Every structure is written in structure tokens, then in C-alpha cells.
Amino acid sequence: LRSLLGGGFRESGQEEYSKIEMPSIPRKFARVHLTHDIDCPYEYHGVRSLFRAYVKEHKSLWNAYQLAFRSLLSDRYFTFDRFLEWNREVERRLPKGKCKTLFFYKTPSKEPEDRPNYRVTHGAARRVHLYARKYGVEEAFHIPMEGSLHPERIEHQLHLLEHDLKKSITHARYHYLAAREP
């Protein structure tokens, strides 16, 4: 910041920049937030995944069936138990209260960018929610693309997630800033 201000003052012909005192900022983190977006909690799960694997990915019917209806723990996208163990190790190494884990859930939407659609109370997302409760993870709102295109729907989506989680939400994340003005 000092070099930026100094350069600006030098360009304007003023040499007053040396009188500006910048406070020294200690180089340490106040808090560490370990965040995970629950965008796609599974690779294959259910009937739609069966058809996707068979039709779009040209897998054999038997292979597609096995992928779609296997245990979630053997799905390569369902890695939350491992992540939470790693997070726990990080939390142990930091002072108490300086580190927390957050899961950001989406709400169902009609936009293709928001797929797959899921509710926290059903299927694989419910399993993620149970892990969050078991490990003391704070759950938060991941604003979907539909919220960018129709900001008036964000409040409804937030209430839907709060209803599903049965608690109020205090954190939100938004990835689609390029789509609309923040």
C-alpha cells in the first residue's frame, strides 16, 4: 500500500507521501475456516446416474447399475469422511477456537449450472448432513446460479435450506459474481 500511495503522490508531483505512517500488521491468522462446497456430493447415485452412465458415458448396463446403486462410501466423489478427519487434525494443531469447518449447501434450482439438484434431507446430501452433525461442522448457504439471475429468489432459497437444516444460517458463499453485479 505504501508503494502504491507513494507512486501516486510522486506522479502528482507531491513529495508528502513520506509523512504517511502505515500501521504494522502482525503476520498471523486470526481464524482458519476449512470450507467445503457440497456442489456434487456423489458421482453416481440413483436412477438418473444409471441412465447417464449407460447412455451418455456408454458404460455397460451392468457397470452402470453397479455404479448407480453401490454404497456411497465407495463413490469417488463422496470423500467427506476423509476430509473431516483431515480437518480434525488441522484443528488439533491450532489453538482452540481458531479453526472451524464449514459445509456450503446449495438449494434446488432450474439452472443447468446448479445441477445436480438435491435437498439436504434426502439421499447422499442427508449423509453429508449427518457427517456434519457428527463432526460439529457449521453448515452454510451456497447461493446457486439462479440467485444470480433472480436475486429476489435468494431469500426463498435461504428459507428452504434453513427449513431443511432446522436452524438459522449465518454464513453464505457466492461463486457467480461474474454473472451479475455483487
Where are these regions (language model features)?
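Terminal accessory/targeting
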Residues: L1-V120
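Generic structural signal for well-ordered alpha-helices
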Residues: R2, F80-R88, A125-L130, I154-H159
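Acidic, His- and aromatic-enriched active-site or binding-groove loops in soluble protein domains
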Residues: Y54-H58, V120-H142, D164-S168
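Short alpha-helix boundary/capping motifs
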Residues: Y77, H122, Y176-A178
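Residues at alpha-helix termini
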Residues: E89, R93, K134, L160-D164
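Conserved radical SAM core fold
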Residues: T107-P112, E139-S148
